[in-house]
Amino acid sequence: MSRRHKAEKREINPDPKFGDLVITKFMNAVMLHGKKSVAESIVYGALDAIEAKAKSEPVALFHQALDNVAPHIEVRSRRVGGATYQVPVDVRPERRQALAIRWLINAARGRNETTMVDRLSGELLDAANNRGSAVKKREDTHRMAEANRAFSHYRW
């Protein structure tokens, strides 16, 4: 892996319905096999379902869910003298957002509702209320970091 140049971030256009960059990133993560229109209908369908169920602003609820799932600290492996330590490190804001999006989508795919729209809306509502698999994943990550706090002086 070359260390000479830093990879430039690609420009992402905001989504057409809400004008939100994060929703576009979320849509791109939901997308499978390049089928953007399918991903768009899933995400917009889930946000419409949230609006119907919660009777509140779906974009605000979406951002609340992302904030509740985003980890603040995680563990990274570090080899020191033949032993591998799990060292707790702070999570950069871009990675925090990417992990939150990934965990929400994986948790939604693991649910047992019939359609992806129902699964995604259910997981987003659960995450906004600090419940669900994605929030549990964040809590497990934080618990791991807390358990390995003794190795925090190995931070790099």
Swiss-Prot record:
Q: How does it assemble?
A: Part of the 30S ribosomal subunit. Contacts proteins S9 and S11.
Signal peptide range equals none
UniProt source species:
Brucella canis (strain ATCC 23365 / NCTC 10854 / RM-666)
The keyword tRNA-binding is assigned to this record: yes
Q: Which HAMAP family match?
A: Ribosomal_uS7_B (MF_00480_B)
Q: Which family does it belong to?
A: Belongs to the universal ribosomal protein uS7 family.
Q: Which Pfam families match?
A: Ribosomal_S7
Q: What does this protein do?
A: One of the primary rRNA binding proteins, it binds directly to 16S rRNA where it nucleates assembly of the head domain of the 30S subunit. Is located at the subunit interface close to the decoding center, probably blocks exit of the E-site tRNA.
- Protein name (record): Small ribosomal subunit protein uS7
Q: By its UniProt entry, which NCBIfam families does this protein fall under?
A: rpsG_bact
Q: Which domain of life is it from?
A: Bacteria
The record's listing under PANTHER family reads: RIBOSOMAL PROTEIN S7
* UniProt entry keywords in alphabetical sequence: Ribonucleoprotein, Ribosomal protein, RNA-binding, rRNA-binding, tRNA-binding
The Swiss-Prot or TrEMBL record annotates one GO molecular function as:
tRNA binding
The cross-references to CDD domains, in alphabetical order and at most eight, read:
uS7_Bacteria
Q: Name one GO biological process term.
A: translation
Taken from the UniProt entry, a GO cellular component term is: small ribosomal subunit
